[in-house]
């Protein structure tokens, strides 16, 4: 009986070590091709140039995108809470990737594939910032790994408030509007 437990323990330990080494190899491999994220600390999105008449009326708006930068402190709490509720309920408690969210999405997507329903994502707001600022929209496992690595690094480098500020000023909200302020006009 003791040999059985010993063999099971060795088997489980071997699986754990194999899994750990595999993860380290994947992380090391992808870390070499990760874009530099440090510019996000001081990033300000491009805003439109506006021309006003002598009496203060807007004459022209020169831009391809409608965009108005709003600092985190000026974004209404209801707007922040709405996005957190819809996009990333655990934003303030995860380290960039929400393990529970990933597991939920895997389970739900297996069920959705079986019933021909739409697949759901598990990207956190930080992962969306990584994708929108640093990666392409390519749908691939490689991009998701890079996105996760970047999310962990961004979370170590920036405050949660700064990450939300970037997200809420960069997200496309339709009709050419980028960011919550431009979308509110």
Describe the role of every protein-language-model region.
Residues 1-185:
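Juxtamembrane regions of bacterial inner-membrane/periplasmic proteins
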């Amino acid at each position: 009986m003791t040999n059985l437990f010993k063999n099971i323990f060795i088997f489980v330990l071997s699986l754990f070590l194999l899994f750990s080494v595999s993860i380290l190899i994947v992380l090391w491999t992808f870390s070499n091709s990760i874009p530099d994220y440090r510019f996000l600390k001081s990033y300000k999105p491009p805003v439109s140039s506006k021309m006003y008449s002598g009496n203060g009326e807007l004459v022209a708006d020169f831009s391809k995108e409608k965009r108005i930068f709003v600092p985190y402190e000026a974004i209404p709490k209801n707007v922040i809470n709405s996005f957190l509720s819809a996009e990333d309920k655990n934003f303030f408690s995860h380290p960039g990737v929400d393990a529970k969210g990933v597991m939920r999405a895997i389970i739900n997507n297996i069920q959705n594939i079986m019933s021909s329903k739409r697949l759901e994502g598990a990207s956190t707001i930080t992962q969306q910032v990584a994708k929108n600022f640093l990666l392409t929209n390519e749908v691939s496992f490689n991009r998701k790994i890079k996105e996760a690595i970047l999310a962990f690094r961004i979370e170590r480098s920036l405050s949660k408030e700064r990450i939300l500020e970037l997200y809420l000023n960069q997200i496309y909200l339709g009709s050419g509007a980028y960011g919550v302020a431009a979308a509110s006009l």
